[in-house]
Amino acid sequence: MELWYTEQHTENVRFSIKVEKEIHTEKTEFQRIDVLEAKEFGRFFTLDGLMMVTEKDEFIYHDMIVHVPMATNPNIKNVLVIGAGDGGTIRELTRYSTVEKIDMVEIDKRVVDICREYFPLTSCKLDDKRVNVFYEDGLKFIRDKEDEYDLIIVDSTDPFGPGEGLFTKEFYGNCYKALREDGILVNQHESPYYDNDAAAMKEAHEKITKFFPIIRVYQAHIPTYPSGHWLFGFASKKYHPIKDFDAEAWNKLGIKTKYYNTDLHVGCFALPTYVRDMLNGLTD
């Protein structure tokens, strides 16, 4: 009998992957976690049935959520990552010798434990001496932070369930306060393609625009996320991701990536017309 993983993208659209075996499943205090093995995408895990990470395409997401802001401001030293229990975002950040401190906040310790056990590809740098892991709600963690971080990356789940609070106006206001005077906020921005995802994306984007003077949106193709068309939000107090971008300086670092490059850095901010119309002037 064949085993398939299926995610409901809309009432009329489903995405399926043929599964070779089930590796682990459990219900934590916060959510259900499943680890599966597939011939096409390798090992992957889901939270409450929603795709989080696959071994085959994780590099796309993690390259884009990290290297775009890091290349925009080469002087980033203190970073806060909210979510990111799989460790992929941390892995990419630790490639920069200039980064001095990385605080990672994950609400569900079991996500980290499971990824340490089953996903060494992404979790391999969680024990880096610069990394501090806090198991608590990111919304609460950031409330008492002020003028502390150069970069905040919100590598959260979707805007419901445990990650719901990370899409609120209060949260984005606290992120602004926690950033230094030239700080950058980057968050996964959902997909613009299906109506429900697009509505969540637009709502989150509108909230961020209330606080930051520089607002942009960029994109990547991630095959296992809904529609494959995925957006990231870039919000900054000072640095513009294209006008202040020094491609030559980043290339001199010699960081080898599988997806990100300096040509793509500029190109990923060129949005399709339907996305630009959806944002309706909500970028600088």
From Swiss-Prot:
Pathway: Amine and polyamine biosynthesis; spermidine biosynthesis; spermidine from putrescine: step 1/1. It is found in: Cytoplasm. Disulfide bonds: none annotated. Residues 2-237 form the PABS domain. Keywords: Cytoplasm, Polyamine biosynthesis, Spermidine biosynthesis, Transferase. It comes from the Bacteria. It catalyses: S-adenosyl 3-(methylsulfanyl)propylamine + putrescine = S-methyl-5'-thioadenosine + spermidine + H(+). The keyword Transferase applies. Its main location: cytoplasm. Its EC number is 2.5.1.16. Gene3D superfamilies: Spermidine synthase, tetramerisation domain (2.30.140.10), Vaccinia Virus protein VP39 (3.40.50.150). GO terms for molecular function: spermidine synthase activity. GO terms for cellular component: cytosol. Spermidine binds at residues 62, 86, 155-158. Signal peptide: none annotated. Pfam families: Spermine_synt_N, Spermine_synth. Homodimer or homotetramer. Belongs to the spermidine/spermine synthase family. Catalyzes the irreversible transfer of a propylamine group from the amino donor S-adenosylmethioninamine (decarboxy-AdoMet) to putrescine (1,4-diaminobutane) to yield spermidine. This is Polyamine aminopropyltransferase. It comes from Clostridium beijerinckii (strain ATCC 51743 / NCIMB 8052). The gene is speE.
